[in-house]
Amino acid sequence: MSDVTYPAELEIVPLAKAPAAPVTVPGSKSITNRALVLAALSSRAKECTLTGALRSEDTEVMVDGLKRLGYTVRADWPRVTVGNTGPRLVPHAEADLFVANSGTTMRFLTALCAAGKGRFRLDGVPRMRERPIEDLLGALRSCGVGASSETGNGCPPVLIETDGLIGPGATIRGDTSSQFVSALLMVAPWNECPSRDFGIKLDGPLVSEPYVRMTEQMMLRWGATWRYAADQRVYTFDAESCASYFGPDDYAIEPDASAASYFWAAAAITGGRVTVSGLNRNSLQGDVRFVDVLAQMGCRVGECESGITVHGGKLHGVDADMNDISDTVMTLGAVACFADGPTTIRNVAHIRHKETDRIAALAAELRKLGAEVEERADGLTITPGPLSGCAVDTYNDHRMAMSLALVGLKVPGVVIRNPGCVAKTYPEFWRDLERLG
């Protein structure tokens, strides 16, 4: 794991002046973990080297999981090479995997194990054992896989007993987590359905849709093919789908747009100017659209060859459907505290099933700081009030910690409890935040 050490509590020092600086954030966690899985799936053909890969708890448990499944992974961060010296799609026929609190690793490796042959068990920290995965397990059972929750409650630990994806396909709900859909899509080209006409049908609303689009774009880069019937919402994979699923020799990973949101928000809150390098509007990551919300609030947003810049301005409250960019809900919550009126965040009920119940947690902590918060099933409304510093809880949630810290850039006395939880996706966050000053 990363060698960064953290105190039990960290007081945020308000900025003496508005920042005017470029910022470089690490590689995208979402892209890194997808690329690791895609590289593993294509590694019987050749090795794939990822550049710009994020080193964090989430990506390190993914690397550990792939190694335990028998893949060769050489991690010289931010450069990672993945290979497979054996003839099997999943080299080992048995493995016990521990994914800590990494949702992407749990969902993606559950599907990867299902595409192999053998018996596998996947487990995580206590919070992971509370996060639902039954929708994915049910879909895998439709694919002919023995997939179950060890305790019978629809949450990890997960047990997989499989001879491959031999069923005709599955229907998968997307209203709990888009990662269930992405997990199935990445392994679908390797199905062993006798008819070689393997279908994945989407059922109901799809949350965080840009992450599925990210998965599709990355699969295309790896050479996968499929047909999609939009009227029926069905992906079909046939005998040709994995014929060229060999991937690139090298794959460059974008900076993390979710991480960038904290620095764009810092510009908004302080009236400063921050450019996050290496990102543009054509990013694979939907979270770059967080700057559009900031623009609606009164910020000025610019794009140049080096990155995307946010200039802070007088902030207005907004009414925002954040379903597509729900990882930035907490960031917006912090910015909303400095607006001239209420901000309503809608259509994000699914974030109650993240590292913590993010709606309830955000409401509780912003109230401590002085904001008025109305909590609803699918979101919340934040009305600014007189803010004062206090110790805030992070619920062991990296995004809660990074978002609440933004309030401390203007309000003295904000203390972050358990600041080390940022190691999940951004181990160097506190160093980079301090550099804004």
Q: Where are these predicted regions, by residue range?
A:
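Short, structured segments at the rim of ligand-binding sites
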Residues: 1-437
